[in-house]
Structures are given as C-alpha cells and as structure tokens.
Amino acid sequence: METYKRLVFNTALNFLQHREEAEDITQEVFIEVYQSLSKFKEQSTISTWIYRITVNKCLDHLRAKKRQKRFGFLTGLFHPESGEVLAEISHFDHPGIEMEKKEKAQFLFKAIEALPENQKTAFILWHIEELPQKEIAEIMQSSVKAVESLLQRAKANLRKELEKIYPERRNERN
C-alpha cells in the first residue's frame, strides 16, 4: 500500500500544487478504495483503477475551488463594502524544485492549471507521472488516439501561454 500512497499523493500534488490539499485527497482516495474494493472488476490493473479515482477526486476538488472562487467574486460584486479578500492567489508549494527554478516552475504550473480539464489530465499523467499513453487512455476512459490529440493540444496551448511570459523564447522549439 505504501507504493500506492506515494503514487496517489504525488499525482494529487501535481494536480493541486498544495501539500495539505494533496494529503486530504490522498486520504479521500484511500477511503474510496477501501469502500469500493468489492466493486473493482479487474478489467484494468489496480494502479490504473487507483489513478482513475485519484484523478477524479482531484478534478472534483478543483471544480469545487473554482465554484467557491466564483461565488466569492459574485458575492463581492453585491457586497463590495466588505473589505474581504475574496480570491487569494494560490501560493506555489511543490517539493523537490530548486529555489532558482521555483519561479519558472510556478509559471509552468499556472499555465498547466489553465489548460482545459482533459488536456491537463493527459499532460500531467504523461509528462509528470510518466505513464504510458495506453494506461492514460484507460484512466481517462478514451482511446490512445484521443490521448495523443489531447497531448498535442496541451503542448500547443502551453507553448502559447509560456510565450506570453517568455517572448524571447518564441522561436525555440523542443
């Protein structure tokens, strides 16, 4: 189980970029795994099943945060006299990245966060979690071709976002 705990935590951290939120999601995932173990049909590997639960929990959490921010913004429109800060800029909290690279990594994660949900999921699972495209397709319940397309669009969208920040790198291609 320790292997799966690291897998779940690291995946959640890559999606959420906050240690405390990743820890909460990790707990939620294992509660769901425990409660749903009898429903596991072995049509995929246990790790793929756990990844799918993790990704779904992370996406649900991100959706809830967006709703909360929108609600706070709308509340602020109707009650501007409350001097409350409604949408705090999230701080970057990702271990293992050297200090001098932190700013660049922060821009990258902000750009990843702005991707459409399905592109973000495919990108994180491929480039950060380093899963094979076939497994990503199983996790996302789509075809390998669809995953390839999502990855291409994610890369193009990230390039556009990062070129806004680093215009001097516009002509560089990896």
Residue positions per predicted region:
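Helix-turn-helix DNA-binding module
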Residues: Q106-A146
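Sigma70-family region 2
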Residues: N14-H18, F30-T45, A64-K66
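Short, Lys/Arg-enriched C-terminal cap helix and immediately downstream tail that follows
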Residues: R63-K66, L115, K120, K155-R173
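Structural recognition of an alpha-helix C-terminal capping motif at a helix-to-coil junction
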Residues: N10, D24-I31, S44-N56
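Arg/Lys-rich amphipathic alpha helix in sigma70-family domain 2
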Residues: S38-K41, V55-F73
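Short, charged helix-capping/linker segments at alpha-helix termini
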Residues: F9-E28, V144, Y166-N174
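Amphipathic, Lys/Arg- and hydrophobic-enriched alpha-helical face
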Residues: M1-R19, S36, I112, E161-K164
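Internal acidic/polar
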Residues: Q68-E98
